[in-house]
Amino acid sequence: MSQDATLEKVRSIVSEQLSVDAGEVKLESNFQNDLGADSLDTVELVMALEEAFDIEIPDEAAEGIATVGDAVKYIEDKQG
């Protein structure tokens, strides 16, 4: 999957999970500061990403995923 395709899929998931317009979801968007996610939203978002991309995101890694770009990079790295 290309980075653009990954970004679009992440953008769609984030938009749905956080009830924000997909246009607001940019690479630099911080889940909590920019998109209004709380800690429960973040956990649910990680679970949705794991399911959508068929990957496992350990808690330690999830703590380092603060932005949409972080999520895309992590997924790209996992899918090699």
Swiss-Prot record:
Post-translational modification (record): 4'-phosphopantetheine is transferred from CoA to a specific serine of apo-ACP by AcpS. This modification is essential for activity because fatty acids are bound in thioester linkage to the sulfhydryl of the prosthetic group.
Keywords carried by this UniProt record: Cytoplasm, Fatty acid biosynthesis, Fatty acid metabolism, Lipid biosynthesis, Lipid metabolism, Phosphopantetheine, Phosphoprotein
Gene Ontology MF: a single term: acyl carrier activity
Superkingdom, taxonomy of origin: Bacteria
Subcellular location: Cytoplasm
GO cellular component: cytosol; membrane
SUPFAM superfamilies linked to this entry: ACP-like (SSF47336)
Pfam family, one: PP-binding
Modification type O-(pantetheine 4'-phosphoryl)serine: residues: 39
Pathway the protein acts in: Lipid metabolism; fatty acid biosynthesis
Gene3D superfamilies: ACP-like
Residue span(s) of domain Carrier: 4-79
One GO BP: lipid A biosynthetic process
Signal peptide: none
Family: Belongs to the acyl carrier protein (ACP) family.
Function statement: Carrier of the growing fatty acid chain in fatty acid biosynthesis.
Protein name: Acyl carrier protein
Source species of the chain: Prochlorococcus marinus (strain MIT 9211)
